[in-house]
């Protein structure tokens, strides 16, 4: 059974992160890890995985609006394989369509003074995790 979870909003420049619990079906933004052309700062990601010690990791799969794969979809799948091998955790992929749009909307709803990329990416990871938990 799933216990604690981490969700990842994969991106070429930044990777958004959220943590969650299946028992409460809630997700909380953790922050972001910088990436260079899709390669994350593995040292920082290692620290986060060690600290949160998730049973499973959920990774958003970037598809286009008609659920077709894009250039970044392959990069996200390769990243997911690396995460699975590196951390020896179950990795789940989920369509992340509109997660960034939903994150921006949520920040605007709470009148966040500064809608930064960091906030958006971490909140997008929350949306990904909430969606996955609702389906599982």
From Swiss-Prot:
Coiled coil: none
MF-aspect GO terms: nuclease activity
EC number: 3.1.-.-
UniProt subcellular location: Cytoplasm
GO CC annotation terms, alphabetical: cytosol
Source domain of life: Bacteria
One Pfam short name: RuvX
Keywords: Cytoplasm, Hydrolase, Nuclease, Ribosome biogenesis
Classification via PANTHER family: POLYNUCLEOTIDYL TRANSFERASE, RIBONUCLEASE H-LIKE SUPERFAMILY PROTEIN (PTHR33317:SF4)
Family as reported in the entry's similarity comment: Belongs to the YqgF nuclease family.
Protein name: Putative pre-16S rRNA nuclease
């Amino acid at each position: 059974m799933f216990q604690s979870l981490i969700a990842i909003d994969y991106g070429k420049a930044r990777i958004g992160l959220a943590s969650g619990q299946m028992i409460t079906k809630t997700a909380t933004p953790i922050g972001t890890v910088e990436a260079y052309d899709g390669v994350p700062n593995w040292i920082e990601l290692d620290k986060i995985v060690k600290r949160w010690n998730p049973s499973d990791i959920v990774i958003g799969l970037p598809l286009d609006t008609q659920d077709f794969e894009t250039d970044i979809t392959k990069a996200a799948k390769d990243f997911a394989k690396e995460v699975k091998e590196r951390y020896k955790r179950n990795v789940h992929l989920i369509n992340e369509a509109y997660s960034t749009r939903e994150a921006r909307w949520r920040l605007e709803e709470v009148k966040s003074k500064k809608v930064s990329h960091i906030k958006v990416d971490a909140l997008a990871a929350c949306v990904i995790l909430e969606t996955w938990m609702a389906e599982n």
